[in-house]
Amino acid sequence: MAQFAQVMAEVGDFGRFQVRLTILMGIPNFLSAFFVFSQVFMVLDEAHYCSVSWVKNHTFNLSAAEQLAVSIPNDTAGRPESCLMFRPPPDNASLEDILSHRFNETQACDSGWDYPENRPPSLKNEFDLVCERENLKRTSQSVFMAGLLVGALVFGPVCDWIGRRPSLLMQLLLSGIASMATAFVSSFELYMTLRFALATANAGFLLSSNVLLSEWVGTSRRTRAMVLAQSNFALGLMALAGLAYGVRNWRLLQIIGTTPIFLLVFYFWVLPESPRWLLSQGRTEEAKQLVQKAALVNGRPLASELLNQLVPEKTGPSGNALDLFRHPQLRKVTLILIAVWFVDSLLYYGLGFQVGDFGLDIYLTQVIFGVVEVPARLSSIPMMEKLGRKWSQLCTLTLAGVMCVIIIFIPGDLPTVATALAVVGKFASSAAFTISYVYTAELLPTIIRQTGMGLVSIFSRVGGIITPLVMLLEQYHKAIPMLIFGSLPIGAGLLCALLPETRGQTLKDTLQDLEQGQPPRSYKTAPQRKDVEASGRTSSARVAVVRSSYF
């Protein structure tokens, strides 16, 4: 009988069929950039002042500037306050008394806010996300990140239950519906609810697409294929900048950014199911048909004798989450990986959500952020091969953290310098995130690899949820968020020095292999041992069995 891996080796690790699938799976990653970061361009800073009805209703015949002067106090810099107004004077007050600021007691805005005329509709001016409601901007981003966590927890089992293909199709449809409905909301609370639903579905299709890709691509090309698919997220960041620059109406931007997902209806006819999943469900004939189709597309038709021998791969014993903490060596590795993944997310989204805070044009900065992500992710592969996994992870996290700390000391009149440092930090954080997937998969034993990946992914999502809340600390001091975004990655990076190197090492299969540091496969003679270890070094340098994508 032939194992699935043997048959797929004859089909080809990365032929024309897998290339097509990589392109198909890259599209959801491309669209995901809009869903994650589009709100940044819908809440841009704009002037706002208390709407003062008594001035508007009076027949003083004052100009707009005079109305502002008699109704709004100035701050310490001499600019009109955004969240305070003078108390309305008595009805019998004369114009002279009002102009002399005789009635100069202030209060919070009680009738809404006025915004510049002819301004495009935005989330900020439609739902008054200013003053005491300004924190809702960050809260809604945390709600979205919480949806990503829930989606990963919910759709992981769904993907295993109904299959990769139907799960992916369902999640794409739900994403489109939730995102399109967001453009027609009448309250910000409803907006946040739909964003949560969108994030849940978004996490689902990212998970399903990467699972499907990992189960079709051979081990020698799996890491590269998944990095290529994830690089489409960076292309989506660049496209988002151009789209947001041209479309300033937030509702229209939401509609245009969502529409492409409905064009993926052709996935219903071209998207294949995972043959590995079909075999696990006992649907052997369907799996054989798919494998033969892939072989024909790759120009490597299979012999019917080999195909008829296809049987599911045998699964070994599995572990649980508690096993990650029972063994001293694995406990140390797990705790450090939790810190690394938490910081990966905190840093990546911290820089992404602050794209407009570095002084340069927000649209230009967004394009630059997208541009640097592509080489950052692609360069992580040769970096890991040259420096090793441990030092690549340590250096990228530390570099990103140092950049964030330096930004704190850059004067506000040097936006180019601050942006340049942020770009270097963005490059390093993107590379660090990609390295984490490979390094984590190689550090954890086979029997508990998926469980461990799931656990650290949860903490990564928690980091994403906390990121917008950390940014709220800027109301106490502007440097606090960037100090946190800088110091934590440096600490996590230095912790990586305590981890073992996995470059050129045989992947561990059991908990005993990890603790004893012994090769996981048995051998009878010295030549067989060399062959096995050489094979392990060859494969482990390229293989990271990653079943989900955070980006």
UniProtKB/Swiss-Prot annotation:
A Pfam family: Sugar_tr
Compartment list: Apical cell membrane
Membrane topology: Multi-pass membrane protein
Annotated TM spans: 23-43, 143-163, 168-188, 196-216, 227-247, 252-272, 333-353, 355-375, 394-412, 417-439, 453-473, 479-499
Catalytic activities: nicotinate(in) + a carboxylate(out) = nicotinate(out) + a carboxylate(in)
This protein's GO CC annotations: apical plasma membrane; endoplasmic reticulum; Golgi apparatus; plasma membrane
Mod. after translation: Glycosylated.
Gene3D superfamilies (UniProt xref): MFS general substrate transporter like domains
InterPro entries, A to Z: MFS_dom, MFS_sugar_transport-like, MFS_trans_sf, Sugar_transporter_CS
A GO biological-process term: positive regulation of T cell mediated cytotoxicity directed against tumor cell target
GO terms for MF: nicotinate transmembrane transporter activity; urate transmembrane transporter activity
Chain positions covered by the region annotation Disordered: 515-537
Alphabetic keyword roster: Cell membrane, Membrane, Transmembrane, Transmembrane helix
Family the UniProt entry places it in: Belongs to the major facilitator (TC 2.A.1) superfamily. Organic cation transporter (TC 2.A.1.19) family.
Role of this protein: Anion antiporter that mediates the transport of nicotinate. Possibly involved in nicotinate intestinal reabsorption.
Name of the protein described by the UniProt record: Solute carrier family 22 member 13
Gene this chain is encoded by: Slc22a13
